Amino acid sequence: MKETRYFYVPEAATQQELPEEEANHAVRVLRLQPGDEIMLMDGKGCFYRAEVTVAASHHCNYKIVETLPQERQWRGHLHLAMAPTKMMDRVEWFAEKATEIGFDELSMLDCQFSERRVVKKDRLDRIVVSAVKQSRKAWVPVVNEMMSFKQFIAQHTTGHRFIAHCYEEVPKVNLFEELQKISSSLSPLTSHPSPHTSDLSPLTSDLSPLLVLIGPEGDFSIDEVRMAVEAGFVSVDLGKSRLRTETAALSAVMMMQLAMQK
């Protein structure tokens, strides 16, 4: 029995043809033939069971057999913002693993002590999509362009916001404990509806986005921490261990996931 193959097609519901890169993989690598079953994922909360109708050298057509809306595995919008590491492969590792765990949005911060100020967003997008297909996630995380720390703080003024750092002179609380408090305050029925549905339950009104900031290897500057706290961010630690940037970022995603799982 053939394993069902998954393909990322953002407009799966309205298209009848795989995107060029996916089509080449389907036809040239997997050698799919008309009649073969495939699974499409639109990255917005829906899978589609489909059947290949045409498999040619440069294109692969399909017809949708069944639409399969997916249930969210967590509540709320999980957003991680980090200063990229000097070695880009460590950021790519984080993006892959965080996507496998599950989160909604990734932002890159240009901080005072940043070791890298240029990030190839298109490469991160490809890594995230690949991880989504591998882990069978229904939502593709958004990857944002890099932004200065000051500009980012100014643009993110609502929701549950946290900044993780190592400064002893700035009082901190534990991130996971704070997330658990938020989770316990929510209605047990609170859900995050699929973008494919228009029915917004009133129970979603208490579900503000979650945002955690992770600094570069040299940490945020003390001025950046104070700027964030003055803007309403909660000063937090991730526990007693001293972590590398990408490890801290992944730990924060895991904490958000654990606290907000349905």
Task: Name each model feature, range by range.
Residues M1-Q70, D122, S184, T197:
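N-terminal positively charged helical leader segments and presequences
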Residues K181-P209:
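Intrinsic disorder/low-complexity segments
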Residues L210-M227:
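A C-terminal functional module that forms or caps the active site or interfaces directly
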Residues E71-C166:
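RNA substrate-binding interface of SAM-dependent RNA methyltransferases
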Residues M147-L186, L210:
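A mid-sequence, solvent-exposed acidic-amphipathic segment
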Residues I222-K262:
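Structured adenosyl-cofactor binding patch, chiefly the S-adenosyl-L-methionine
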Residues T67, C111-S114, K240-S241:
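Short, ordered loop/turn segments at secondary-structure junctions
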